[in-house]
Amino acid sequence: MSFGRDMELEHFDERDKAQRYSRGSRVNGLPSPTHSAHCSFYRTRTLQTLSSEKKAKKVRFYRNGDRYFKGIVYAISPDRFRSFEALLADLTRTLSDNVNLPQGVRTIYTIDGLKKISSLDQLVEGESYVCGSIEPFKKLEYTKNVNPNWSVNVKTTSASRAVSSLATAKGSPSEVRENKDFIRPKLVTIIRSGVKPRKAVRILLNKKTAHSFEQVLTDITDAIKLDSGVVKRLYTLDGKQVMCLQDFFGDDDIFIACGPEKFRYQDDFLLDESECRVVKSTSYTKIASSSRRSTTKSPGPSRRSKSPASTSSVNGTPGSQLSTPRSGKSPSPSPTSPGSLRKQRSSQHGGSSTSLASTKVCSSMDENDGPGEEVSEEGFQIPATITERYKVGRTIGDGNFAVVKECVERSTAREYALKIIKKSKCRGKEHMIQNEVSILRRVKHPNIVLLIEEMDVPTELYLVMELVKGGDLFDAITSTNKYTERDASGMLYNLASAIKYLHSLNIVHRDIKPENLLVYEHQDGSKSLKLGDFGLATIVDGPLYTVCGTPTYVAPEIIAETGYGLKVDIWAAGVITYILLCGFPPFRGSGDDQEVLFDQILMGQVDFPSPYWDNVSDSAKELITMMLLVDVDQRFSAVQVLEHPWVNDDGLPENEHQLSVAGKIKKHFNTGPKPNSTAAGVSVIATTALDKERQVFRRRRNQDVRSRYKAQPAPPELNSESEDYSPSSSETVRSPNSPF
């Protein structure tokens, strides 16, 4: 994958070339992640053909490996889904949650798993398909899947209940259904089995929520979210297995939920102090006696579970949810999502069924321990949940607060990077790491480095990250002999696409620079850029005042401290575009004195000196000017950048000149040789939010700095996202409250 001297960057010309010749040809929708050229569909067609193309195809989608999901019907039409990627994104919002497809929908299989669907044209009217992430296809009889009843008005036959049975119950379902006099309103606590501290949920059982034993187990599965799958067995604190619905309404109020694993932890049936605090508020009669037990009966051998068993800390504040979701999915599920259906019903306490999943008491970031753990050379005890799924190799990166290791998924042989953050080095700054990870959970885009999976244990935080092995943006330019405006345009297209996506989520990156733009090579040989390092990223819900970023790329409103928002990323992208076309930045300081640099940025005077810009098109210069406007309201947005002719190919010159920028980039920037093409990607992954704290850039207070901006009162205090930092001329920085 290394960049040879003969490598050409034509692969960055990824937009639809056909649109230069027929403006209406882009009917196949959004570009693919690599933005490869699409064929034009603009041909002479009959009205009958056009009508058939627009007709919606009704197909049913199932979740890979989910035997309890009945599927969801989609109407597929060109008007609703302009591309296959748009369908995948919509399916992710509908079908993905913390337990099911937590990494989103990335693959669609035929119902028999023999073929992968790669385009909308391959979907057949009336057929069924299976949605998966990166795991292999799991062969099940998906068309026979059944769900428990969510409405008290729906009758269920004993035959259908027998099919969906999750455990062997005493007596037939018909007997249980006929006699439900034992059901009375009762609040029970379900504790997930595994190492402590453990997650606990509180559930209300009554005639509206407890229709059958199978349905209660399914709702407990949704609430407790075992990593090992559905809840297979429930035990009382005495070690007695719950066999039927009536067992919930006995003397026991606390139950241990177990998955399909064969072995139990020896102390599964002992409650520690934190767990006792959670259940104490309901005055359970068995708590005191259970906490005094020295030994308990275990339904299985006293061995550590060989299956993954993530646990969560239990907090003593009943009724509060303390964790953020591990999955970066939309907080508001699609109306067709099973999860959203359950939430809608849970709010209807009057006459409809109530979901048990809505009665969660508390949760925390999952923690893991167990057998099969590996001890690395640095002394990290890698959890079994990680080692069972991934083969962890040697250390490939070492930062101030994180270590990066080779990581290969066992089932697919895909290479990832395992980022291990030592919590002892982050004491007092944990919220900074949590902010970075919470942003990574939310984002999923072809031009952004992905967080694949995370695991939180008491001493470390483990993040499985996408490993981009093609070097950074400067590596791509300096290692090629042929480089034109079209290549630079393609690179900006990738960057602007990522920025547009982030800004649609009200996320500002605040540290966009060439070192954080990595080159990803796709299987078809095409390449695209991926944006990484979200250490300074944050949610924008009002003006921000923290002075942070990298001086060369920092926007004037950040320096002026008048409050800033999303468009600081556009300024940084404009600076990068300028560098891509001439090899040096538009604003340059003198030596270590950053006063000159900051004054130039505040002035915002962009020049295109000769002879460096003589062969660059006027369209490119116009775009850069609009991206580097000091007036934020007049500055382009990410959408406007993508719509500009120079980016969408209409404004590119017919006779392109080769740009000689490699030498100037090496002169103006630190682009020394790297040990390999993977080094840049590893360096980005090894960086954490805490690393931004280690450099300081300051400036003398200039009372005239704010004169060109609208007067705004300074905030009484910085918001919580701004731990204050700073740098040297090319390093990422934050500054104190009064940095100048």
UniProtKB/Swiss-Prot annotation:
Residue sites binding ATP per the record: 396-404, 419
Compositional bias segments (type: Acidic residues): 366-377
Task of the protein: Probable kinase that may be involved in a calcium-signaling pathway controlling neuronal migration in the developing brain. May also participate in functions of the mature nervous system.
A biological process term (GO) from this entry: axon extension
Gene: DCLK1
Name assigned to this protein: Serine/threonine-protein kinase DCLK1
InterPro entries membership: Doublecortin_dom, Doublecortin_dom_sf, Kinase-like_dom_sf, Prot_kinase_dom, Protein_kinase_ATP_BS, Ser/Thr_kinase_AS
Organism of derivation: Homo sapiens (Human)
Gene3D superfamilies, per the entry: Doublecortin domain (3.10.20.230), Phosphorylase Kinase, domain 1 (3.30.200.20), Transferase(Phosphotransferase) domain 1 (1.10.510.10)
Record field: catalytic activity: L-seryl-[protein] + ATP = O-phospho-L-seryl-[protein] + ADP + H(+); L-threonyl-[protein] + ATP = O-phospho-L-threonyl-[protein] + ADP + H(+)
